[in-house]
């Protein structure tokens, strides 16, 4: 019982899961690609073969990629929403010329959709860059030792900053 005298529910509170992304869309494909990079970065971080000099950068890359994936999924759902709205507008107005105001609204939605998808593509490219850089450094350090790649290990931090910035800007753009 709580202070109001009512019994508390015995079932746990369930948080609604976000809706699934529309199948067969570019945005769903981009999020799936990010899932692949997150999975591989997780495996890389746990790899016994990962040189010690890359342990911290690998953890940071994984955390950044997971955060990027979360932002990308929210943005992809926003693109799905725009796709749904555009589909409905076209289905209802089929064969009719839109009014100037409706045409302007449709143009804004298409423009926003295009900008969000371009930002998703760029964000994925940033994750790819960090991932491949870590793989390259891991191979190089395995072959030549830690003394040869100090500056390059530091450059991973810079790439991570660029990645975080790209997804921070994407999140702001999606909120507009």
Segments the model singles out, each with a brief description of its role:
Residues 81-176:
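Soluble C-terminal extramembrane regulatory/interaction domains of multi-pass membrane proteins
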């Amino acid at each position: 019982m709580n202070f109001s005298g009512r019994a508390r529910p015995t079932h746990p509170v369930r948080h609604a899961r976000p809706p699934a992304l529309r199948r067969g869309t570019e945005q769903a494909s981009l999020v799936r690609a990010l899932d692949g990079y997150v999975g591989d970065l997780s495996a890389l971080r746990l790899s016994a073969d990962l040189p010690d000099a890359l342990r911290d950068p690998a953890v940071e890359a994984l955390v950044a990629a997971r955060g990027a994936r979360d932002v990308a999924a929210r943005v992809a759902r926003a693109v799905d929403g725009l796709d749904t709205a555009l589909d409905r507008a076209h289905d209802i107005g089929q064969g009719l010329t839109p009014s100037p105001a409706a045409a302007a609204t449709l143009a804004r939605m298409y423009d926003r959709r295009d900008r969000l998808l371009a930002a998703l593509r760029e964000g994925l490219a940033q994750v790819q860059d960090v991932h491949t850089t870590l793989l390259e450094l891991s191979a190089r350090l395995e072959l030549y030792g830690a003394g040869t790649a100090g500056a390059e290990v530091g450059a991973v931090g810079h790439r991570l900053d660029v990645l975080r910035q790209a997804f921070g800007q994407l999140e702001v753009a999606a909120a507009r």
